[in-house]
């Protein structure tokens, strides 16, 4: 089974080797049809501390690394300066 992958934006990098990534999920309301945006935050392992706030990143699922950390950084898609 392939590991899950997500694309999101780094909202915090204040922890050592850990970043917080916010991922938006857009879906239509079942009755009214309005587009509803839901945001979920994931703690992600960043081994080299190379991400900054505002970077767009791809993350992938991994084994549990701590109580709340189950994702690792796959790649940096774009930095805040280039977005």
UniProtKB/Swiss-Prot annotation:
GO terms for cellular component: cytosolic small ribosomal subunit. Keywords: Ribonucleoprotein, Ribosomal protein, RNA-binding, rRNA-binding. SUPFAM superfamilies: Nucleic acid-binding proteins. It comes from the Bacteria. One of its GO terms (biological process) is translation. It holds the Pfam family Ribosomal_S17. GO terms for molecular function: rRNA binding; structural constituent of ribosome. The keyword tRNA processing does not apply. One of the primary rRNA binding proteins, it binds specifically to the 5'-end of 16S ribosomal RNA. Part of the 30S ribosomal subunit. Belongs to the universal ribosomal protein uS17 family. This is Small ribosomal subunit protein uS17. The gene is rpsQ.
């Amino acid at each position: 089974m392939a590991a899950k992958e997500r694309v999101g934006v780094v909202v915090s990098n204040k922890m050592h080797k850990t970043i917080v990534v916010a991922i938006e999920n857009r879906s239509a309301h079942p009755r009214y049809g309005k587009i509803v945006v839901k945001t979920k935050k994931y703690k992600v392992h960043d081994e080299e501390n190379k991400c900054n706030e505002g970077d767009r990143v791809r993350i992938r699922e991994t084994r549990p690394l701590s109580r709340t950390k189950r994702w690792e950084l796959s790649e940096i898609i774009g930095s805040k300066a280039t977005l």
